[in-house]
Amino acid sequence: YKNMEKNKVAVIGAGLMGNGIAQACATAGYDVVNIDTFEAAIEKSKATVEKLFSRKVAKGSMTEEKKAEILGRLTYSQNFEDVKGAFLVVEAVPEKIEIKKDTFKKVDELADAETIIVSNTSGLSISEIASVTNRPDKVMGAHFFYPAPVMKLLELVRGLVTSDETYDVVKEFAGKIGKTTVDAPEFPGFMVNRILVPMQNEAAFMVMEGSKPEDVDNAMKLGCNHPMGPIELTDFVGIDTMLATMTGLYNGFHDSKYRPCPLLETMVKSGMLGKKTGQGFYKYDEKGNKIGSNF
């Protein structure tokens, strides 16, 4: 695959995920351009990486030379034209199908003919996203987990017409950036979220039925060795985010087993979104420490 030698990767979106993915690619030796139309997002992304690497240098887990070398491979741009020359484009824009499609359309028009475009969606249809391009065979899903530089998993998701060659290139790229891959089906939630989020939803039903959040969390932490209970995880991720995923499963499968817990909907409507708002299933202080329960 002649394009693999180009060594250039473009990451679209400089938010939490895009920033982490760009960092992972640059650390692995790729030349990365992180593209975002918002200057504020780029400035924040730059500052985040700079701060993180400076902390590593201070702790002694990274040398100044290594830091300079990695940052030297990481450039930022507000211009989509800069996808030119990249063998791979990773899209990490907000999880809304219209934004994804607009982004893919734009990248498809500007990228080299043989460039592969992958989406970091956590559950939207790859085939639908690919349909707006002239290269649906060169489109697939590559779902990273937060924080992207640290989490070892990459869910690979083929669309209906993704080619074997595209899959092979993306799998090889995943290995080079130190990720272990799983082949996830092109259905809502892919693999991790389809198993994880219904567990969080079931835990919310238990709280709705009168169980204490601490009891539900302790049951799973001590009984199943989970590092974090399902209720605290929901607060941590954001109740709105978790509910959106659950609703996506429900609408995608049209199956009542994915019925979102009504308590979650009430909480979201009331503005209790979890740790980020200071109020969720638990109450939090300004520093984000748990100071009690709301149930």
Where are the regions that the model predicts?
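NAD(P)-dependent Rossmann-like dehydrogenase/reductase catalytic/cofactor-binding core
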Residues: K2-E5, A28-V33, D168, G175-E186, ...
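Helix N-cap / loop-to-helix initiation motif
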Residues: F38, T63, S163, S211-D215
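Rossmann-like NAD(P)-binding element
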Residues: R55-I116, G123-L124
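NAD(P)+-binding Rossmann beta1-loop-alpha1 motif at the extreme N-terminus of oxidoreductases
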Residues: K2-R55
